[in-house]
Amino acid sequence: MVLFSLVATHADIDLETVAQLSNGSSELASAALTDSSVVSGAVVLATCNRYEVYGETANGADLEAARSALVSQISELSGLNEQLVSRSFATHTGPDVTRHLFAVSAGLDSAVVGEREIAGQVRRALITAQQEGTASSGLVRLFQAASKTAKDVGAQTALGSRGLSIVSVALDLATDLAENDDWTTKKVVVFGTGAYAGATMSLLRERGCTDISVYSSSGRAEGFVATRGGTALDADTLPAAVAAADVMIGCSGSDNRVEAADLARVRANSGKPLIAIDLALTHDFDPAVGELDGVELLTLESVRLAAPQEQAESLSQASAIVNGAATSFESEREARSVDTAIVALRRHTMNVLDAEMEKVRARHGCTAAAEEVEFALRRMVKQLLHIPTVRARELAANGQQDDYVAALEALYGIQVEQPQAAAPASECPVDHEQLRSESA
């Protein structure tokens, strides 16, 4: 089985294109497995500044077809031209897939380097794929190893020790822009009830903010504030809350964005400045709100440009952990890939031995001599299999496991069966209730 990934991030393309690509991302994995025979597994990682698709296919010969199938699906779901979609994604294969995901999960590839929110997003991406039955066994191992690597980086280095995140940097920027930097006096309206909104609520509380209202176009605000505090808003109470707000923060990414004309009308008699923080990749606020008098607009691009740099020592230590973990994972995966071939060779050889022993017993009976012959033959077979087994491990370590499998098929006619591609959700030990609460 071959792993690959399609990667579109803030580092390579503008965030507007990332946002457009990610439209329909929740449907991609299932659609790809349904419509394509060459994509045997898929996990989608979509965050505020990246859209990545991790896939698995049976062999390297199917790789281009699998990529094309995913590009076609993304084009259909997003409404973007297929050529534009193809150009927007970098394709990773081989060890680069592992190294990239491990770095992403550890926060090394984030707009705010060292931020910890991404580790949870990587974990939730796997859980979602497991629920939908699109996570192949190889992808499950990859994402679980990435999560473990992120934990190791957090435990063994000072990377992220300042607790920086996209939300915290955005709030720091808002503090710098505000005439009054005291959050205890501010009225805040939060749009959204997902994981980002939850992180925003927590950080606002840490800064002393108590007057927080929450709006959800899907009607989830009541349940959200029931466990986190704050005031739930609906369509009727939202305008008054926005009119009185000092800060409004967009975390939902819904289709119901706040238009500049509507905001101007609602705040016509406000008489005080407003800071609008748009953390949604697909924009909760019309970009034109930043042109309104008395309104300062902060976006993900603002956060990226303002993000402080981590210390070189922490980055070096974290990178070493990521590289070591990626190398170990690849070595284990390559060794594992020949296990089925080794088992197939042993089964083939033992079947031949058993067939010959049946002939011996049929001719001579179950005598002591027959038992001695069988014992000698089994010992000889074990010795004969030793070198092919050792060579299999050596070839796998050098990435030549396919050569070994091809040799078995050419010399002995042994067909090596690939392991089952997909891991159904019902067989995966995931906490589905926790997932639902985090994505609400």
UniProtKB/Swiss-Prot annotation:
Keyword Oxidoreductase set for record: yes
Species of provenance: Paenarthrobacter aurescens (strain TC1)
Binding site for NADP(+): 192-197
Subunit structure, as described in the record: Homodimer.
Coiled-coil ranges from the UniProt annotation: none
GO biological process terms on file: protoporphyrinogen IX biosynthetic process from glutamate
SUPFAM superfamilies attached to this UniProt entry: Glutamyl tRNA-reductase catalytic, N-terminal domain, Glutamyl tRNA-reductase dimerization domain, NAD(P)-binding Rossmann-fold domains
Name of the protein in its database record: Glutamyl-tRNA reductase
EC number: 1.2.1.70
Keywords: NADP, Oxidoreductase, Porphyrin biosynthesis
Note: During catalysis, the active site Cys acts as a nucleophile attacking the alpha-carbonyl group of tRNA-bound glutamate with the formation of a thioester intermediate between enzyme and glutamate, and the concomitant release of tRNA(Glu). The thioester intermediate is finally reduced by direct hydride transfer from NADPH, to form the product GSA.
